[in-house]
């Protein structure tokens, strides 16, 4: 009996490791292929390999050569601007909104939370025509600020629900003790609730940064001129030309997108992991 239990446990453990190894291959292999393609000479992917026989930095040099048809530096700056402002704006809006839902009781509170969940079920592309018409009416075609506001609005519902669940796990006794000492709701938020909510705030910040950085659908709808493009839109147009497509240069540009994401993740790694775990178990 004991031997059978050990065998079953060994089989489950072996299956778990095989599953993890399979998932690791699925995740890592495309990254290695992209990295290898960026160092391969030529523009085609047919003759590329993960380990280039004759590696070259020509594609990276081409990105920063300042060609009119390849404004990579400008696209990079645009993406960083949009992502950073979206991250800051969404973090501010989400924390304030979640605090209100977590600590105050008002009419329509439960309906608003339900509405937040329902909004997540509506596909983004279903509102593209309305958003484009709105941008035209406001005269904000090619406007990064309109794009930032749209991203912030899209991030608020789900992230607010996550943050609210985390704030609910913070004991109300802390608020009551602070109120006895004469602290206002604003002071309680900034000096007690917000510092204790840093783990989940890191998750919200990461979502706010990576979402706009990798978005193509909405940004391609609002941004129409090359100088206003973000990286996904600019790199797509780089390979959209059938005759002049440069897939290896695209690979080099795509690889560089991961640098700011990696930097932000490393900075927030400790809080990010604990906050993600807490968001799934608390509230």
Swiss-Prot record:
The keyword Transport applies. Gene3D superfamilies: MetI-like. CDD domains: TM_PBP2. GO terms for biological process: maltodextrin transmembrane transport; maltose transport. Coiled coil: none annotated. GO terms for cellular component: plasma membrane. Belongs to the binding-protein-dependent transport system permease family. The complex is composed of two ATP-binding proteins (MsmX), two transmembrane proteins (GanP and GanQ) and a solute-binding protein (GanS). This is Galactooligosaccharides transport system permease protein GanQ.
